[in-house]
Amino acid sequence: MIVFPEHALERMEERGASRQEVRRTVWEEESFPDRQDRMGFRFEFEFGAEWNGTYYEKKELTVYAAPGGEDGSDWIIVTVISRFY
């Protein structure tokens, strides 16, 4: 399960990332260790649309999450970084 705290949801909205995109990035894409037992996940999406008045071909999400749940199999989203290009 992926848990979206209010802070993460606010940052996602500000940065143009949907829950669906974050879920895909966490479950299906490249991961890398981060500090303090967190993990980072990264995925490049075909975008082909405007964001804040500028057209971009691609969008890259970097998701930082901490393990959660009783058995550590859940992910609690810490923050999401979006990069458009």
Q: Each PLM stretch: what is its role?
A:
Residues M1-Y85:
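Ribonuclease/tRNase effector modules and their secretory precursors
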